[in-house]
C-alpha cells in the first residue's frame, strides 16, 4: 500500500493512523515536502518515487482515487510500466476546475473504473471506456458517513464557541481554471 499526500498531514486529519489500524502489510510511505509549493517538484518527486517502487515491486494493479494532480503522476508511471490502474470517481465533473482534466486523464489510463452514479458511468463510456470495465459502486465516502457518530448542534456550538441559531452551510470548490475562449 502506497500512502502519501494529505494522509500524512496533521491539519487534514492525519488519516494515516486509520490506515495503520486496518493492519495492512507492506505499507510504503511517500513523503512529499508539502511546504514546497512548486507543482513541478512535487509531481516529479512522486513520479520518481513511484517509478522506483513499481520497478522493484512490480504490482499487478494500482488503485487510484480522485482527481488530484499527484495521482496523475502515479497513473503516468503505471502507463509506462504497463501496470493496470483501477480508478475510483472517474467521469465526474467539477466545472471550472483543473480536477476535470486530471480525472479524465487518469480515467483514460485506467483499465477498470468504479463510478458513483450512472451519469458518470455514461460519461466514461462516451470517453471510449469499455462498459464491461465500469462498475457502478456508489461512493465510499457516503458509505463512511453512516459509520461515524454525528456531532450534535449543541456540541458543535460548544466546540466552536458560537451560538448557531439561524445557520446554513456553504461549501465552495474554488475555480482553478477558466475557459479562456468564452
What do the PLM-derived regions correspond to, one by one?
Residues 1-3, 29-34, 85-90, 138, ...:
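Short beta-strands and strand-loop turn motifs
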Residues 11-15, 74, 98, 182:
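Residues at alpha-helix caps and immediate loop-helix transition turns in enzyme cores, especially N-
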Residues 7-11, 109-181:
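A nucleotide-sugar donor-handling region in carbohydrate enzymes
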Residues 2-42:
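Conserved nucleotide-sugar phosphate-binding/catalytic loop shared by glycosyltransferases and other
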Residues 32-131:
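Active-site and donor-binding regions of nucleotide-sugar-utilizing enzymes
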Residues 21-24, 80, 129-131, 163:
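Short, well-ordered coil/turn elements that cap or connect secondary structure elements
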